[in-house]
Each structure stands twice: as C-alpha cells, then as structure tokens.
Amino acid sequence: MDIRQVTETIAMIEEQNFDIRTITMGISLLDCIDPDINRAAEKIYQKITTKAANLVAVGDEIAAELGIPIVNKRVSVTPISLIGAATDATDYVVLAKALDKAAKEIGVDFIGGFSALVQKGYQKGDEILINSIPRALAETDKVCSSVNIGSTKSGINMTAVADMGRIIKETANLSDMGVAKLVVFANAVEDNPFMAGAFHGVGEADVIINVGVSGPGVVKRALEKVRGQSFDVVAETVKKTAFKITRIGQLVGQMASERLGVEFGIVDLSLAPTPAVGDSVARVLEEMGLETVGTHGTTAALALLNDQVKKGGVMACNQVGGLSGAFIPVSEDEGMIAAVQNGSLNLEKLEAMTAICSVGLDMIAIPEDTPAETIAAMIADEAAIGVINMKTTAVRIIPKGKEGDMIEFGGLLGTAPVMRVNGASSVDFISRGGQIPAPIHSFKN
C-alpha cells in the first residue's frame, strides 16, 4: 500500500464519516429447542452469552487497532418461531426477554431474530410469534423482529400481510420505539448483518461473523472530484470507491472471526446512511446532478449507484451477501428528510426507488390514524416489487402523529417527518386473504 492509499483511508475515516456499521454474530439456536419454554429460554441465554461473550471486546479492540470506528456490535439468532413451536406456550414473550437479557449481559446494541418465515403459510409457532410481537417489543429494549411474508418462489401470503398491518398498529400503540424494530420482508436473506431485519438462517453455520459497512460520505467526496463528467466516469468512480470500502470491511470481518474462533460469513455491500451531515445516500444521488432527491432522474441515479457498489464490492471480497445495495431510510438520512420536508419526495416516489435499492419503505413515519388495511396494502405493494423482481424488499413503517409532524427517535434512527398517505380504502382488497401465487419466471427447475 503506497502513501497515497494510506492518506486516502485516513481521510475516509476522519473527514468522510466512513465506519464499519456493524459486526454481527449469527448464532444458531436449533440446539436450544425444548418442550418446556422456560428451559428453552435458559438454553438460549446460556448459548448467546457463551458464544458472544467476547464480541464487544474484540470489536473495540479491532477498532482501536485499525483506527476505524465500529459503530455497532450485534447478534442475530435462528427465527424464534422455530424454537417456540416445540413448546405448548401460547405466546413467546418469555423467549424475547431471554434474548434481551442475553444482549444486555454481553453488551451488544441489538439482537435480531424474533422472527417468522411465513411466505407460504403458517406453521404452529408462526402465528403465536406474530401475535407476540407487540408485547415482546414493548417489554424489551434490544430485541428486533422481522416477518417474511413473501418470496419469488412462493408468492405472497396475503393472510400474513393483513395480520402484519394489524400487528404494526398494535405495536405502535404499545410502545414508542417498537415499530422501529419491526420489519416485514419479501425475499428475506439469511445472512443479513443489519437491524432490524437480521436473523440467522437455518442453512448457516452454527456461529458466524457478518459485517456491514457504511460509506455514503466517501462516495460523495469521490463524485465531487468528477463533477460534470460523463456517467461512464461516475460509474467507474463509484465502483473503485466501493472496492476500497469493502476491502476494509473484509479485513475487519476476518480479524473478528479469527479472534473469536468462529467462521467468517459475509460482507454486506450496502451503503448505510446516518442522520449526520456528510453521511447521506440522498446527497450522493444529488451529487450526480439532481437538484433534490425525489425529482425525475432519482431512480436512474439510484440504479447506477446500487449496481456499481455491487460491482466494486464483489471484486474486493470473496464472500458477499446480506442485502447489498443502497439503503434509503428516511429518518436515518438527513438528505431524505430534507427532500420530504421540501415536498419533492413522497411515498409514491420512494416506492419506485425500492424497485432498485437494497431494502424498501424504511423508517417512514405515516399518520397514526392510517388504517391497518392501508398499512397491509403498502406491505403488499412492496412485497410485489420484491417478488416480481427477485430481490429483497421490506417495510418498516412508523404510524405516529399527524401529517407534517416530526417524530424524534434519536441516535442512528434519527428524525422522521410524517408523510401523506393516499386516503382511498384498500379494505376489500386486503380482506380477501389467501395467497398471491408465485410469478411464472420463478419456475426454474
């Protein structure tokens, strides 16, 4: 590495808000299954506190050694609906509390996996877990929840979609922060290091380390140097920058896995913003020539960014995965917040952008009087985009306040302006239930 690369890396960290967003340890809980829910809870606590005992210390050690901030240390676990199904319990709040207790004991920021996979229907534990979500999130501090309601191979479980509209409303009524820790997915991935949607897939190794990086500020600074040049130059610049960011992510992941004595999983190539000025995906898109995010051309700019991040990242790391793309959470991106406030970015444009970005309608505040069926219909729209386009999409919606209000979450979750929602009813559509079949192009065998 020559001196220029060293100075570039220092500038990325000190001036451009580069950091490792998360080191996430995935832990299988399949060996914690027990017909007695209290024994299962104890086994879960013991396994997490044993396997992840040194996660925070190792993360801090690597951050100090390399001089690179590692913002979050997290844990993801096997979907709890699979663990709870072996018991006769009628709710799984006790398992959520075991996760929360373990997370506090080891000092991690969040623990994900209070989850169910229901893309083709409910098994015994799924419905119980889904109905436990409002209380589980209200009575814990660090637990995150996700439900996968659709996939390209299975179609969309519209009964589950309707249920999740209701659950989001109930969760919002029971706690202020609960809905910020609840994600509804289509095509959820098993190795996601980011919250709130992380869970440890059943096909994964017993314990793994996954890494998520953050570098919108680095990309923006690189694009400032090629202002006015062609898209060919823009694409090459983004690709080279993504390579540098991902290289550091792989180094951190490999160091963590070696020191913790567990397998290295993947680096997630996502560009994850924060509310800090200079750490915004929206500002990257504007640097390409848009007056403001939300205007015509936004979706094309996002497509270029997303694709080149993947191309640069894949060359830098031999194991990539997770969501891998650009995140567009409204409350967590100061440029997105500004675009909503000036009227150029609305829900409909955000939905179009989700056909390309790595997640979906993320951290978006809507009026608290929005009907559950309307929320369910928003989930159905997002799921349809994901299912048809063979990509992950998700909804993390915050029904709080009234249109125009600002909802304050603090920290990385930021501030969300309450956005206008189409007032026409979707009740008859959502009340049908059943399954939207898988698309024809999913039939590959």
From Swiss-Prot:
Bridged cysteine pairs (disulfide): none
Lineage: Bacteria, Bacillati, Bacillota, Bacilli, Lactobacillales
Family: Belongs to the UPF0210 family.
Assembly: Homodimer.
InterPro entries: UPF0210 (IPR007841)
Signal sequence, start to end: none
Name of the featured protein: UPF0210 protein SPG_0223
Source domain of life: Bacteria
